[in-house]
C-alpha cells in the first residue's frame, strides 16, 4: 500500500527541501503563518518548472473565514486560470455560507472551471469549519472534488482521529480523505493505521537564520514579535522521516 505525502510550502527554498525529503505532491501557498494564501504567479511558474511531482496551488484571496464577497470570488476564478497558465496540476479551495454550510453554487463554478482547465481539485480545511461534516462530505463528492484536506474538525489530525476514521468509512473511496494539521514523523504511522487515510499533509516547518551580515534590529516589516531575520522553511529530514514512517507500514 502506498501513501501520498503532500507538503505545503510558501517559498522556493522549501520546494527543494520538500522534494529532497520525498514529497509526492506540493501544495503551493503564500503566508503559511496565516493558514496559507494564494501564491504569486511568479512562484507558481518557477515551481512548475522545478518540481518533479504534481503541484496544487492554494486559492485563498485573504486570511480569515471562508465566506467570500463577489470581488473575492472573482479573484479566485482569475487565480485558478493563473494556476493553469503557470503549468500546475491542481488547485485547493473551500467556500462556506454564512450558516456554516458548503457554498455549493459557488464551489460548483470553481470546480467546473478547474476541470475545464484539466486541473484537479482539493477542498481544503474550510471543511473543518462546516456545521454538518457528513452532509458536507456528500456535497463535496457530488461536486467532483478529488479529496478533502481535514483535521477531523479538531485542532490537529491526531486529535481528530475519530472523525477522520468515520469520514474515510463514509467516503467509500469516492474521494480521498487527506489528514492534515499536526502531522509529524512521530504520529503519522498511527494516524494512518487508525483512520485508514492514504494521504497526509504537513509543512515540516522549521527555520533558518538570515544570511544577512547587517541586522537592522530596530525596524520591523510586520508584527512586533516577528523576527525578520529568521526564515521559515520546510525541514527536509521531517519530510523524509514522515515518508519513511509510512513506508514502514506499507
Curated annotation (Swiss-Prot):
Q: Where are the transmembrane segments?
A: none
State the InterPro entries in the record: CutC-like, CutC-like_dom_sf
Molecular function terms, GO-annotated:
copper ion binding
Superkingdom of the source species: Bacteria
| Locations listed in the record | Cytoplasm
Q: Which Gene3D superfamilies match?
A: Copper homeostasis (CutC) domain (3.20.20.380)
Alphabetical keyword list? Cytoplasm
Kindly list the GO CC terms recorded for this protein: cytoplasm
HAMAP family (UniProt xref): CutC
Family classification: Belongs to the CutC family.
Q: What is this protein called?
A: PF03932 family protein CutC
Amino acid at each position: 500500500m502506498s501513501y501520498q505525502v503532500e507538503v505545503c510550502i510558501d517559498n522556493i527554498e522549501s520546494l527543494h527541501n520538500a522534494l529532497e525529503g520525498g514529497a509526492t505532491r506540493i501544495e503551493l501557498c503564500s503566508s503559511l503563518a496565516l493558514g496559507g494564501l494564494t501564491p504569486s504567479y511568479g512562484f507558481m511558474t518557477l515551481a512548475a518548472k522545478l518540481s518533479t511531482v504534481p503541484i496544487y496551488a492554494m486559492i485563498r484571496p485573504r486570511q480569515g473565514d471562508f465566506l467570500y464577497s463577489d470581488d473575492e470570488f472573482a479573484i479566485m476564478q482569475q487565480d485558478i486560470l493563473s494556476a493553469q497558465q503557470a503549468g500546475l496540476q491542481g488547485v485547493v479551495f473551500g467556500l462556506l455560507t454564512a450558516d456554516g454550510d458548503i457554498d455549493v453554487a459557488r464551489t460548483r463554478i470553481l470546480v467546473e472551471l478547474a476541470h475545464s482547465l484539466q486541473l484537479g481539485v482539493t477542498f481544503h480545511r474550510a471543511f473543518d469549519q462546516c456545521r454538518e461534516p457528513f452532509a458536507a462530505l456528500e456535497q463535496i463528492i457530488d461536486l467532483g472534488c478529488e479529496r478533502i484536506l481535514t483535521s477531523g474538525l479538531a485542532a490537529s489530525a491526531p486529535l481528530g482521529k475519530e472523525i477522520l476514521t468515520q469520514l474515510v468509512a463514509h467516503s467509500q473511496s469516492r474521494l480521498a480523505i487527506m489528514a492534515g494539521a499536526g502531522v509529524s514523523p512521530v504520529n503519522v504511522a498511527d494516524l494512518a493505521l487508525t483512520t485508514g487515510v492514504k494521504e497526509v499533509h504537513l509543512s515540516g516547518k522549521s527555520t533558518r537564520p538570515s544570511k544577512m551580515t547587517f541586522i537592522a534590529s530596530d525596524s520591523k516589516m510586520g508584527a512586533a514579535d516577528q523576527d525578520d531575520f529568521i526564515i521559515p522553511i520546510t525541514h527536509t529530514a521531517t519530510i523524509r522521516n514522515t515518508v519513511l514512517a509510512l513506508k514502514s507500514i506499507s
